[in-house]
A protein has these predicted regions:
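Non-catalytic accessory regions flanking glycosidase/transglycosidase catalytic cores in CAZymes
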Residues: 1-200
């Protein structure tokens, strides 16, 4: 089965309705396989709501961190790369629900550009490994001829972003965190991550 994208524009007649239902119904007998349905307002900016961007601009925050909180300890950054419609949805291991992976590195970097703010990226030091972290740095900051830089270019971004702010993990001292470990163990893990990331 080959999935296809079908963009549709429609107008909601009554904007005051609180409990509306959106349905996709075939006109003939048969079977529909729907990967996902995404609804965005017409005035969205690269997938972000214009009103939310306006509010964020008003904050004038100098730095934005992503991915945030406990979520990062189970997040695989590879899942947020490539065409949005082909990204795998994943069960969110830190919280309930499903992560659609609509926002990955490229979208986060675009958000920072739109807000004129510095990106700050957290790497997965919970269930993630050293190589994944170093590869993520290379994907963001590596030259076009590096393995990750080539992949970044294939995904539409030739020039490296030169991300300056990075962190290793999130609250690894807490037993609520995926991959929780003792302070002594995390110091060793942190340093091995940092060494590999600095070498990129």
């Amino acid at each position: 089965t080959t999935y296809r994208k079908y963009p549709v524009h429609f107008l909601a007649f009554d904007h005051k309705v609180k409990d509306a239902t959106f349905s996709i119904c075939p006109q003939k007998e048969g079977r529909l396989w729907i990967g996902t349905a995404s609804l965005m307002p017409d005035d969205h900016i690269d997938g972000f709501r214009a009103d939310v961007l306006a509010l964020l601009r008003g904050l004038k925050a100098p730095v934005y961190r992503w991915p945030g909180g406990n979520f990062v300890s189970g997040y695989d950054w590879h899942d947020g790369i490539g065409e949005r419609d082909k990204r795998p949805p994943r069960r969110n291991p830190a919280w309930t629900g499903v992560e659609s992976n609509d926002v990955g590195i490229h979208e986060f970097m675009r958000l920072c550009e739109l807000l004129d703010t510095e990106p700050y990226i957290a790497v997965n030091a919970g269930l993630g490994g050293v190589k994944e972290a170093a590869d993520e740095v290379e994907y963001c900051n590596g030259a076009e001829d590096t393995p990750m830089g080539k992949w970044r270019k294939q995904n539409g971004q030739a020039k490296p972003w030169k991300v300056k702010w990075w962190s290793v993990g999130n609250e690894m001292f807490g037993d609520w965190q995926l991959g929780f470990m003792s302070t002594e163990a995390f110091v060793k893990k942190h340093n091995s991550f940092a060494d590999a990331m600095w070498k990129v």
